[in-house]
Swiss-Prot record:
Ligand binding (Mg(2+) 1): 97, 230
Gene name per UniProt: trpD
Pathway: Amino-acid biosynthesis; L-tryptophan biosynthesis; L-tryptophan from chorismate: step 2/5
EC number, as in UniProt: 2.4.2.18
Protein known as: Anthranilate phosphoribosyltransferase
Length: 355
C-alpha cells in the first residue's frame, strides 16, 4: 500500500489479511468517511473488517484524530476532566458516569462532558441531562459559558460531530457494534486533559487506554468484571492506569475503599424521567448502592485528574471518595446542578439571539 495515496481496495485487503493499518492509513479512511466520499458499502466493509481483525490503538488513534480535527470547536477551557462510559453493557443501569461528572465538578474540578442520547439503553447521558433541565444542544461558545459559570459543560455529540451522519446508514444496516461505538469517549471536542472512561468490551478497554496514552493524557480506563462500563460495586474491576505515555493494568476491589458488594439489580434504571428522579435523590444525599457507585466513579475521575499512580490507586480513590461525599453532603452537588441548568438555559438564549 502506498502511504501517500491509499485506496479502499488496499485498505480492505490489508484488514482481510489481518494486518494492522498505520495511523495515517486509518486517518485516510476516516477522512473519506467523514467527508462523504466513501460509499455505504465501503464504510460497512471497513467497519466489519476492522472489527473482525481487531482494532489497534494506532488505528483508533488515526480514526479519532480525524474526528477531532473535523469537530465543531469549543473555546480553550484549560485543564478539564471527562467522565464517560462507552455504553453497550446491556445492563440498563442508571446514568452513573453522568451523576459522577456532576459530583466531580462540585469538588471544584472543571468537567467537560461529551455524550449522546441512548443507543442500547432507555436513557443516555443527553436524555438524563435534558430531563434534569440542562440545555444540551449548545454550541462550543455555549458550552464554554456553562463551564465558566457553573464549572461543568456538556458537548452533545450530534452538534459537534455532524460529519458522522455519513456513516449512519451503514452503521444502522450492519447492526453490530463496531469501532464507531467506541470513538465517543475519545473525541470530546472540548479536549479535556484527563479522563475516566468505562469500556464494557474487554478487548477494547486496553485499546482505548492505549489511544489516551499516545495523546499523553492522564486517565483511568476501567471495566467492571461483571461487564459494566463503570467501576462496579458488585465485584472487582480491571483498571488501566494511563500516565506519562504508558499504560499499567491493575485490579481494583471496591471493598478496599469500604464499599460492600451490591447486586446489579440495585443499580438498574429506567427511562429519563425515572433516572432524573434518581439523580436528584442521590445528589441530595440519598444513600445506597447507587450513591456508592457514583462516589466511586467520581473519585476515579478526580484520581485521573490529579495524576493516577498504580501503586497508590486504592489510597487515591479512597481520599477522592471523601471529597466527593462531602460535595454531596454539604449540598454543593445539588447546587451545582441547579447552577448548570440556569447557565445552560441562559446560554441557549444567547445562542438563539445570535442566530
Amino acid at each position: 500500500m502506498t502511504a501517500d495515496t491509499p485506496s479502499w481496495p488496499e485498505v480492505l485487503s490489508a484488514l482481510l489479511a489481518r494486518r494492522d493499518l498505520t495511523e495515517a492509513e486509518a486517518a485516510w479512511a476516516m477522512h473519506q468517511i467523514m467527508s462523504g466520499e466513501a460509499t455505504d458499502a465501503q464504510i460497512a466493509a471497513f467497519a466489519v473488517a476492522l472489527r473482525a481483525k481487531g482494532e489497534s490503538a494506532e488505528e483508533v488513534s488515526g480514526l479519532s484524530s480525524v474526528m477531532l480535527a473535523l469537530a465543531a470547536p469549543v473555546p480553550p477551557i484549560g485543564e478539564a476532566l471527562d467522565i464517560v462510559g462507552s455504553g453497550g453493557d446491556r445492563a440498563h443501569t442508571v446514568n452513573i458516569s453522568t451523576m459522577a461528572a456532576i459530583v466531580a465538578a462540585a469538588t471544584g474540578v472543571v468537567v467537560a462532558k461529551h455524550g449522546n442520547r441512548a443507543a442500547s439503553s432507555a436513557c443516555g447521558s443527553a436524555d438524563l441531562l435534558e430531563a434534569l433541565g440542562v440545555a444540551i444542544d449548545l454550541d462550543g461558545a455555549g458550552v464554554a459559558r456553562c463551564i465558566e459559570r457553573a464549572g461543568i459543560g456538556f458537548c452533545f455529540a450530534p452538534v459537534f460531530h455532524p460529519s458522522l451522519r455519513y456513516a449512519a446508514v451503514a452503521r444502522r444496516e450492519i447492526g453490530i457494534p463496531t469501532v464507531f461505538n467506541f470513538l465517543g469517549p475519545l473525541t470530546n471536542p472540548a479536549r479535556p486533559t484527563a479522563s475516566a472512561v468505562g469500556v464494557a468490551d474487554p478487548r477494547m478497554a486496553p485499546v482505548v487506554a492505549g489511544v489516551l496514552a499516545r495523546r499523553g493524557m492522564r486517565a483511568l480506563v476501567f471495566r467492571g468484571d461483571d461487564g459494566l462500563d463503570e467501576l462496579t460495586v458488585t465485584t472487582t474491576s480491571t483498571v488501566w492506569v494511563v500516565r506519562d505515555g504508558s499504560v499499567q493494568e491493575v485490579a481494583f476491589d471496591p471493598r478496599a475503599v469500604g464499599i460492600e458488594p451490591a447486586d446489579t439489580a440495585a443499580l438498574r434504571g429506567a427511562d429519563a424521567r425515572h433516572n432524573a428522579a434518581v439523580a436528584r435523590a442521590v445528589l441530595s444525599g440519598e444513600r445506597g448502592p447507587i450513591r456508592d457507585a457514583v462516589l466511586l466513579n467520581a473519585a476515579a475521575g478526580l484520581t485521573a485528574f490529579d495524576t493516577p499512580r498504580p501503586d497508590q490507586l486504592v489510597d487515591q480513590i479512597s481520599a477522592a471518595m471523601t471529597r466527593c461525599a462531602a460535595a454531596i453532603d454539604t449540598g454543593k452537588a445539588a447546587q451545582l446542578l441547579d447552577a448548570w441548568v440556569e447557565a445552560s438555559q441562559a446560554a441557549r438564549g444567547v445562542d438563539a439571539d445570535r442566530s
